A protein has these predicted regions:
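Membrane-embedded helix-loop-helix hairpins and adjacent transmembrane boundary segments
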Residues: 1-655
Length: 655
């Protein structure tokens, strides 16, 4: 059995210990008030908020999942991640949705609901429903992270993956409970430095392994069966292994995911880092920084995919061995499901004495004396488990010391994403459920303890669902295409349509949320495209129908929202709120923002693609993509950056 060296373990233990110490040191400052605990007192500079935003997208499970698609498809796997991993919604936050939400002065998205719809019993229901759906989404996202962590940790530690994951989750939960948003941002800064350094190291190691693009393409063809592995442009149809056939019509799936996130991006911006920003400029700058920092993730993942190609080629020159190994394990353990396949193989590897000697002997004869190092890559269906490529590369192809640092980097990615997510969900529970419904006059100390309890509860429930998940890809697809799609309409329409009211948001949230949960319970194998279409229609029908069948939001509330947020869209009854030069300035800002969005999307898409083309030494494709990147940068400068700086200069002069 491969295992980490003592130096690697020392690095990992030292990192986790340092994280706990930092959390304890931040406790006093974070506990001075809810504003400090959840938003850092609204005093954190944009570059620290940008690091925190980057960490929310740089998670361990997502990195493993995207690496699996890049392993199967090469750079074209990037286009499948238009469903989430490419962070297309960031373009909308960068240009305008982040600053729209900051202008409210609220602490959470549910609190923002009162700002948008006014003080009423119906608005309170919307606020609580919004908090409930946010907490549910956080729980399922946490389950997704925990499932990925168990796959990762089972490769490195001689204990059941469930227990090692529990230890890591416990450490990160204690840290999040004690340090609040200050600690989230502080560790995100440290972890961001570790992760980016690791990205550069892995990208260089992979680049150095490739003799040339043609040689890589030939090896990839032998390993994956994909004849166009080094291509960067999507195709109408591409071969996919068993279990992933739904992604074969690549252009159709890419287009579908793009439309889904274009719609979803219209309703973004309600994250804590935007509520906590000091100005409109800081909202844009932190988003820009997030995009640049997330870019480093892609050479890391294509690097792992390349090294995985060479690793599988050396370990399994004959793919038939994989099928025979899986069949052998199924024979001795026919009751094992896909959800617990990894736990079974990890147990066989770490405790072979617990299993029949005949099974161990046949595995050794089939896989060779190093059978324990090869078995983790054997998937449930008798093919390479692509979700295990990343930990397999770390275990087999990275030297001691550096291996420990890279494992720490993956821990850091998981901790950063989990900490920010749990902190945000806890804020919703304490502010919008506990204090709002049960203890409106609760003292600060009581509310801080309520945040501790809610953090613990969210983690426990997320851990339970994570253990039961069959696949990180399956769970991620449901979260994005069903659960979140069922909440699209209330989030979008309330920003752009004056007639959208609290009843409409209730209708859209309830119909979409119930639909997503029922779909997962009754039809878990429903295709992602069908999930999205069905839940989106339910959400829009509920929101539009509920709004039109009830009274509109009181005009004074709408006027206050419109005047402070200054949105574009269907706001004709409110346009008279701005007159003359002020009206012209608002229209000019909105027009620039709308034009800037497609340029920002072009910039972001090409920004992530360019470094992957460099790593695989596809220089011709790189120089074809570069002009598109420069067009995006130019458009952003003229339609986003220059107008933003002019407005900031005008505000400074006026004050």
């Amino acid at each position: 059995m491969h295992s980490l060296a003592p130096l690697d373990y020392a690095i990992i233990i030292g990192y986790l210990g340092l994280s706990l110490i930092m959390g304890v040191l931040m406790t006093r400052r974070a506990s001075s008030g809810l504003d400090h605990y959840f938003l850092g007192g609204r005093t954190l500079p944009w570059y620290l908020l940008g690091v925190a935003g980057m960490a929310n997208w740089f998670d361990l499970t997502g990195t493993m999942l995207i690496t699996s698609f890049l392993y199967m498809l090469g750079p074209r796997g990037y286009f499948i991640e238009f469903r989430g991993g490419a962070v297309l919604i960031l373009a909308f936050m960068l240009v305008y949705t982040g600053k729209w939400h900051r202008r409210s002065g609220c602490m959470t998205g549910a609190e923002w609901t009162i700002y948008r719809f006014g003080e009423s019993k119906v608005s309170e229901v919307v606020r609580v429903l919004g908090a409930a759906m946010t907490i549910l989404t956080a729980v399922m996202m946490l389950a997704y992270l925990i499932r990925g962590a168990s796959l990762f940790l089972g490769m490195f530690f001689p204990w059941p993956p469930l227990y090692t994951t529990l230890v890591l989750v416990t450490v990160t939960t204690l840290y999040t409970m004690s340090s609040g948003f200050y600690g989230v941002v502080l560790t995100d800064l440290v972890q961001g430095i570790i992760v980016i350094a690791s990205c550069l190291v892995i990208a260089f190691l992979a680049w150095n392994m490739i003799p040339d693009t043609a040689s890589l393409a030939a090896t990839a063809l032998q390993v994956t069966g994909n004849p166009n592995w080094t291509n960067s442009h999507p195709e109408w149809h591409t071969p996919m292994p068993a279990g992933y056939e739904a992604y074969s019509p690549l252009i159709m799936m890419m287009s579908f995911y793009f439309v889904r996130h274009f719609i979803g991006g219209l309703g973004t911006g309600g994250e804590a880092r935007y509520f906590g920003a000091r100005s409109d400029r800081d909202c844009g700058l932190q988003s820009l920084q997030q995009g640049v920092m997330i870019m480093f993730r892609w050479p890391l993942m294509i690097g792992f995919a390349i090294m995985g190609i060479y690793l599988v080629h050396s370990l399994y020159p004959d793919p038939v061995i994989l099928q025979r190994a899986a069949d052998l394990i199924h024979t001795y353990s026919p009751q094992t499901t896909a959800a617990f396949w990894h736990d079974l193989t990890s147990s066989i590897i770490n405790a072979p004495a617990k299993y029949p000697p005949e099974l161990i002997g046949q595995l050794q004869a089939l896989l060779g004396p190093d059978w324990q190092g090869k078995l983790p890559l054997v998937g449930f269906q008798g093919t390479v488990n692509p979700e295990q490529i990343l930990p397999a590369v770390l275990m087999n192809m990275v030297p001691t010391g550096l291996k420990g640092m890279l494992v720490v980097a993956m821990f850091a990615a998981m901790m950063s994403c989990k900490n920010g997510m749990v902190n945000g969900a806890s804020a919703f529970f304490v502010k919008d459920v506990y204090q709002n419904l049960f203890r409106p006059k609760a003292a600060n100390r009581e509310l801080i303890f309520a945040s501790y309890a809610s953090t613990l509860g969210i983690v426990i429930v997320g851990f339970y669902f994570g253990v039961a998940a069959t696949s990180i890809n399956n769970l991620w697809g449901w979260i994005i295409m069903s659960l979140m799609a069922g909440q699209l309409a209330p989030g979008v329409l309330r920003l752009y349509w004056w007639r959208c009211n609290a009843w409409g948001c209730i209708g859209g949230t309830v119909l979409g949320g119930i639909g997503a949960v029922l779909q997962r319970s009754l039809y878990p194998q429903m295709p992602e495209t069908t999930q999205f279409l069905f839940m989106t229609v339910l959400s829009f029908v509920g929101t539009i129908g509920g709004s039109l069948l009830t009274q509109p939001t009181p005009m004074p509330v709408l006027k206050h929202f419109y005047r402070t947020t200054r949105p574009f869209g269907w706001w004709r009854p409110l346009r008279q709120e701005f007159q003359g030069a002020e009206r012209a300035a608002v229209d000019r800002e909105n027009r620039s923002d709308m034009i800037a969005v497609p340029f920002t999307l072009l910039w972001q898409i090409t920004l992530f693609l360019l470094p992957m083309q460099l790593v695989i030494k596809s220089y011709q494709a790189f120089f074809c993509t570069l002009p598109l990147f420069l067009i995006g940068v130019t458009g952003m400068y003229f339609f986003w950056w220059r107008p933003l700086m002019r407005r900031e200069a005008g505000t400074a002069t006026a004050t």
